[in-house]
UniProtKB/Swiss-Prot annotation:
It comes from Mesoplasma florum (strain ATCC 33453 / NBRC 100688 / NCTC 11704 / L1). GO terms for cellular component: cytosol. Disulfide bonds: none annotated. Zn(2+) binds at C156, C159, C194, C197. ATP binds at G21, C22, M23, F24, A25, G26, K27, T28, D99, E100, I101, Q102. Keywords: ATP-binding, Cytoplasm, DNA synthesis, Kinase, Metal-binding, Nucleotide-binding, Transferase, Zinc. Belongs to the thymidine kinase family. This is Thymidine kinase.
Length: 203
């Protein structure tokens, strides 16, 4: 049976947008811009971030350029879901933003899909690769599911070419392969690097 046109038009369409790339590529800046655009269009917008990310602000998503957007810090997908569903009971939510999805547990991917299926626009950011240049958790799974994917590049902080890798620096030297996967810090711990300037010490 083919649904009639009126039924199709009445159903609010949801989708997933992924903004990805290396560090310092402007992912969060683009994320904030998109959410602000939706808010300007009178849509109800809510943003979340992982508690672990406290580089510039606790209750705001912050870009490296200093742009801020109010957000709700959460420890897990379960906490995000609890807070978001409570907001949805209060009023309609049109757009949900989730920053740094690589820091969430793996349940976040299924919940993002559920929200889109319910007619909500979900905009997420995440690093495509970790400091070892291996696919990052959650981003690798959301990549084939998202309707829109933007992969941003940065400027190599060593040679000035375009960069698509995240270089971890410890005590002024490239990090060892075996150093911890998650280490949230600022400019002192990471650099954007191109293919030629990226280094990893395999100890």
């Amino acid at each position: 049976m083919i649904p009639n046109r009126d039924t199709i038009e009445q159903k609010q369409l949801g989708w997933v947008e992924l903004i990805t790339g290396c560090m310092f590529a402007g992912k969060t800046e683009e994320f904030i811009k998109r959410l602000r655009r939706h808010a300007f269009a009178k849509r109800n917008v809510i943003a979340f971030k992982p508690v672990i990310d406290t580089r510039y602000a606790v209750n705001e998503v912050a870009s490296h350029a200093g742009t801020l957007l109010p957000s709700i810090p959460v420890n897990s997908t379960a906490e995000l879901k609890e807070k978001l569903e409570a907001k949805i009971l209060e009023k309609k939510v049109d757009v949900v933003g989730i920053d740094e999805i690589q820091f969430f547990d793996e349940a976040i991917v299924d919940y993002i899909e559920e929200l889109a299926d319910r007619g909500i626009i979900v905009i997420v950011t995440g690093l495509d690769k970790d400091f070892r240049s291996q696919p990052f958790k959650n981003v690798d799974r959301i990549l084939p599911l998202a309707e829109m994917v933007d992969k941003l590049t940065a400027i190599c902080q060593k040679c000035g070419n375009f960069a698509n890798r995240t270089q971890r620096i410890i005590d002024g030297k490239p990090a060892d392969w075996n150093s911890p996967l998650i280490l949230v810090d600022g400019n002192d711990s990471y650099e954007a690097r191109c293919r030629n300037c990226y280094q990893i010490e395999k100890g």
